[in-house]
Amino acid sequence: MGIFSIANQHIRFAVKLACAIVLALFIGFHFQLETPRWAVLTAAIVAAGPAFAAGGEPYSGAIRYRGMLRIIGTFIGCIAALIIIISMIRAPLLMILVCCVWAGFCTWISSLVRIENSYAWGLSGYTALIIVITIQTEPLLTPQFALERCSEIVIGIGCAILADLLFSPRSIKQEVDRELDSLLVAQYQLMQLCIKHGDSEEVDNAWGDLVRRTAALEGMRSNLNMESSRWVRANRRLKALNTLSLTLITQSCETYLIQNTRPELITDTFRELFETPVETVQDVHRQLKRMRRVIVWTGERETPVTLYSWVGAATRYLLLKRGVISNTKISATEEEILQGEPVVKVESAERHHAMVNFWRTTLSCILGTLFWLWTGWTSGNGAMVMIAVVTSLAMRLPNPRMVCIDFIYGTLAALPLGLLYFLVIIPNTQQSMLLLCLSLAVLGFFIGIEVQKRRLGSMGALASTINIIVLDNPMTFHFSQFLDSALGQIVGCMLAFIVILLVRDKSKDRTGRVLLNQFVSAAVSAMTTNVVRRKENRLPALYQQLFLLMNKFPGDLPKFRLALTMIIAHQRLRDAPIPVNEDLSVFHRQLRRTADHVISAGSDDKRRRYFGLLLDELDIYQEKLRIWEAPPQVTEPVKRLTGMLHKYQNALTDS
């Protein structure tokens, strides 16, 4: 397929994007809005953003969700702008500098919250800056300007959502159903590999792939939840299935590790059972029935705990999977599974990275302010807006440098494209609403094709072109103003790119160390006799951290193995029958405090000191377990955990 070819699967979304732009344009001019450009720009960004992220037509609900986030972010930004202006109207320079800090603060928050919700915070940062810059000449019009911006953005979002509904968006439900079946087969094949105890690299690749697929399934669940309220029951089941899938991975990998020291625990009966190849979910179902009969016949005590737990989790997975596919009423048995354990949310390990993003956004906005004041350029404010937009949106993504390059390419492409519309097309079509709508529909259609291909610069070109062509009411054609706006966009993107290059993000190694120490803390916190604490489900949070570690350090198998070993230790200690007495309870609290000190230590020396203290306390704890006659189900996991911490002490303490 050539560079400029059009695939059939791309046409529907391209028509949808063109329809959203035309609807926003028509409503903006029909109701005599002062700046219809905002409505058109919003419709284009809200519709095209999810398509660019997905690399194709987004699933149902994605555009609505992004639209709601944009509304929330706009209102937060407008309120912040009003507060800043009312408080500092007599000091314009201070007012702009505070807005720069506000943009940085919003970027800091957006780096810490879930990636799905970070868009709202990034948007609120540059919305306040846009309002403050725009009202510099007429500050008394601030409330009216904020109200107009909110109204036109809501209109643009409404047009994008309406266009999405008109062209029957894709449902993700069938993808979810297929992935649930495929995932269970892959889980069974992982357990086969672990019982064979073959090549460790093959096992690592298999469980790593399953971790990624389980994370992708959780993303599908979020999409399905946004799609329609009729999937509420399926959403509840999928939440539990996420935990069950992670449990299956953990039990399989623990089975592999156990055979490193005690291969005799896996009897020949189970080895023969797992030798049978499976291709479909029906094959897995038949094998599980055979295993349950064998477990009943041999007895729970004669079955390795990892296999017993794995078969139980796989059986519950099958039950909930059928419920997701049929979306029927939740049965009493399913309700018992769903009411299981409260899920603990993960604490962000990227606080240093978030602080780097804060300084990048704040410094780039301040640099733009100084450039504007020093040059006195009429479009310096436009450059400032682009700086805020680029840094606010780029910082929350894994590769902000490439986002900046995308914007630079887009603004460069927008100059000749905008010139064509400004000098030729719009002057000749402004007297006819039909021709004006058709001309912008053509723009939206062809850029919509490129957006789905994730063409570098396509998103930036769409937004930048709409921003510089004359879509105001009334239309005025001043070439110098057009050229200033176009050049302001390019200069703003360049300045943002320079700041991102100069303010280096060296937080990667620190984030990796914090993540590994959080795994250690989770394993230590599992040593407790508190009933409420033992019921907490930390597995999704731990695997979310493992997924982040895999993305930060692709191919670093020692780190992945260490993290997985800590997760296995956490799960085993969580279920271990620890003796209940006051002496051990007090010591559990002491262990948790020391583990927290390891995470929060500000220097390598402090971290080594607290880590050494933790190792000493674990030795004392093992002695206490011996005194209180704890069973092997407790002493062996604690001994393995202590040995792992001694072995990897340097990796867990050095920056």
Curated annotation (Swiss-Prot):
It is a multi-pass membrane protein. GO terms for cellular component: plasma membrane. Disulfide bonds: none annotated. It comes from the Bacteria. GO terms for biological process: carboxylic acid transport. Pfam families: FUSC (PF04632). This is p-hydroxybenzoic acid efflux pump subunit AaeB. Keywords: Cell inner membrane, Cell membrane, Membrane, Transmembrane, Transmembrane helix, Transport. Forms an efflux pump with AaeA. Could function as a metabolic relief valve, allowing to eliminate certain compounds when they accumulate to high levels in the cell. Its main location: membrane. Belongs to the aromatic acid exporter ArAE (TC 2.A.85) family. The chain crosses the membrane at residues 13-33, 38-58, 69-89, 93-113, 121-141, 152-172, 370-390, 407-427, 431-451, 459-479, 482-502. GO terms for molecular function: transmembrane transporter activity. It is found in: Cell inner membrane. The keyword Ribonucleoprotein does not apply.
